Amino acid sequence: MSDSVELFTDGACKGNPGPGGWGALLVFKGVEKELWGGEANTTNNRMELTGAIRGLEELKRPCEVTLVTDSQYVMKGITEWMVNWKKRGWKTAAKEPVKNADLWQLLDEQVSRHNVKWQWVRGHIGHPGNERADQLANRGVDEVRGIKS
């Protein structure tokens, strides 16, 4: 794994649940690729996860990835909680089914292809990559709602 990629991801939702969007900004050797999409009835957490999944899916070969997210849910889920969810058969400590297990499993599959370094940043404080991912996620929401950007 020699290729080094930065991946900035975000999710947005107008209502929770409600129309939502995800965004991902890939940066490789100074070249940027923007990805976004949305769903008519979803949650902010599902969109945060989808942004990370779609960004990693876009990589055609194993890479060194620095994935930057403003989602504590994604960050803690992948770095702290998932190991125990998997041991318990995708159940929480309270023996409840893990919410969004379908997406967590897809994310786990994508992460296993790469060497991912997870980085959390506070949202909406002007971090350039995070702000771009936020704009892309909101573009996804707007497209689902039929608003042209």
Curated annotation (Swiss-Prot):
Compartment list: Cytoplasm
Cofactor field: Mg(2+)
One GO cellular component term noted in the UniProt record for this chain: cytoplasm
Family of this protein: Belongs to the RNase H family.
Source organism of the structure: Pseudomonas savastanoi pv. phaseolicola (strain 1448A / Race 6) (Pseudomonas syringae pv. phaseolicola (strain 1448A / Race 6))
Subunit structure: Monomer.
GO molecular function (one): nucleic acid binding
Xref: PROSITE patterns: RNASE_H_1
UniProt key word Thylakoid: no
UniProt keyword Ribonucleoprotein, yes or no: no
Catalysed reactions, as listed in the record: Endonucleolytic cleavage to 5'-phosphomonoester
GO biological process: DNA replication, removal of RNA primer
Cofactor binding note from Swiss-Prot or TrEMBL: Binds 1 Mg(2+) ion per subunit. May bind a second metal ion at a regulatory site, or after substrate binding.
HAMAP family: RNase_H
Sites where the protein binds Mg(2+) 1: D10, E48, D70
Record's protein name: Ribonuclease H
Matches recorded under CDD domains: RNase_HI_prokaryote_like (cd09278)
Protein residues bound to Mg(2+) 2: D10, D134
Pfam families, sorted: RNase_H
Domain called RNase H type-1: residue spans: 1-142
EC number, UniProt record: 3.1.26.4
Function per UniProt: Endonuclease that specifically degrades the RNA of RNA-DNA hybrids.
Keywords noted in UniProt: Cytoplasm, Endonuclease, Hydrolase, Magnesium, Metal-binding, Nuclease
